Structures are given as structure tokens and as C-alpha cells.
Amino acid sequence: MGQPRKSRKKYNTPPHPWNAERIKNENKLMTKYGLKNKKEIWKADTLVRRYSREARYLLGFDMDQMQDEKLELLGHLARTGVLPEGAALEEVLNLTVEDILRRRLQTIVYKKGLARTPKEARMFVVHGHITLNGKKINSPSYVVLKGQEDEIGFYPSSPVAKQIEEYNKNKNEKATEE
């Protein structure tokens, strides 16, 4: 845990700074998910590596204590929506950075159609236009649990909410006419 005054970084940087293929893949992820910087990708990558490391550790044991820890890890990943319910421990080893990035509040706001682009979704979250269970969430990197997806919406007094809902209504009307 460390000292409260000395906060530690939550990510590991890439081993080599100028790998062209890695940089190209990171740039694609940044545009696809509307990320601010590559640090957000590295945080997700560190999470994936942490889950994989724990899964490899647990695959080597068959004791009752380890069985409880397996269920705890799989339950956590199922609650967050990274893995489906009833997934095997071996499936944790196949996780990718995109699996983690899909569960961010910013991405889900975009996928639900509350924003036109991932960058706009990020702006709505940061500016306090988005609520989860009636509470403002200002962090675009908030990991949305599986059961919370339907509770995402605009803040009732948000000036943007009416404009976006009107835009979506007009868009749906045009789609039904065609």
C-alpha cells in the first residue's frame, strides 16, 4: 500500500519507448475509445497483466483456499462485465486491453448513443452531464458494473440532455422513414 503521502503510479510503461507497431496499435485504441493519453492504455494493460498473473498463479493449485480465490477472481471479472458468467479460469489468460476499455463509462456512454463520438462522451462525463444511479460521475475511466449499464443517463438539469435527446429522436425518425 505504501505511504499516503507517496502515491504510486497505477501503470507500467512499455519496455521500449520507440516500438513502431506498439505505437500504431496504441494510436488506434486512442482514436477508437477517445482516450486522452497513452497512460490510460497502459493502466488497462497493467490490469490485464495483473489478472493474467493471478490466473496463472491460481492454475497451479488445486487446494480449497485456491478454489475460493478462483471464484473470487472470476466473480469480480463477471461483475465488471469483462468476462461472461460461468467463464473458466483459462479465459482470463485471453483478456485484452480492449476488454477493459469497453467497460469504461466513457465507452458505454458512446455505445448507448448518448454521445455522437467517444471524445464527446468523455466531455459529457467530465463536465458532469452523465449520471449513474442518479449520481454524477466525473471520471471517464470509471469501470461500469454489468448491472449498472441501464442506469446511465443524463443529469436531469443538464442543458445538453434535451438537445441530445431531440437529436436522437430526429435520427430515429429518419431511420424509420427509410
Swiss-Prot record:
Annotated family: Belongs to the universal ribosomal protein uS4 family.
Gene of this entry: rps4
Keywords from the named record: Ribonucleoprotein, Ribosomal protein, RNA-binding, rRNA-binding
Protein's UniProt keywords contain Ribonucleoprotein: yes
Known partners and oligomeric status: Part of the 30S ribosomal subunit. Contacts protein S5. The interaction surface between S4 and S5 is involved in control of translational fidelity.
Keyword rRNA-binding: yes
Residue ranges, annotated region (Disordered): 1-20
Cellular component GO terms, alphabetical: small ribosomal subunit
InterPro entries according to UniProt: Ribosomal_uS4 (IPR022801), Ribosomal_uS4_arc (IPR022802), Ribosomal_uS4_CS (IPR018079), Ribosomal_uS4_euk/arc (IPR005710), Ribosomal_uS4_N (IPR001912), S4_RNA-bd (IPR002942), S4_RNA-bd_sf (IPR036986)
PANTHER family, sorted: 30S 40S RIBOSOMAL PROTEIN (PTHR11831), 40S RIBOSOMAL PROTEIN S9 (PTHR11831:SF5)
Gene source species: Methanobrevibacter smithii (strain ATCC 35061 / DSM 861 / OCM 144 / PS)
GO biological process, one term: translation
Name this protein carries in UniProt: Small ribosomal subunit protein uS4
Domain of life: Archaea
Biased composition, class Basic residues, residue ranges: 1-11
Matching Gene3D superfamilies: RNA-binding S4 domain
A Pfam family hit: S4
Entry function: One of the primary rRNA binding proteins, it binds directly to 16S rRNA where it nucleates assembly of the body of the 30S subunit. With S5 and S12 plays an important role in translational accuracy.
Domain S4 RNA-binding: 103-170
A GO molecular-function annotation: structural constituent of ribosome
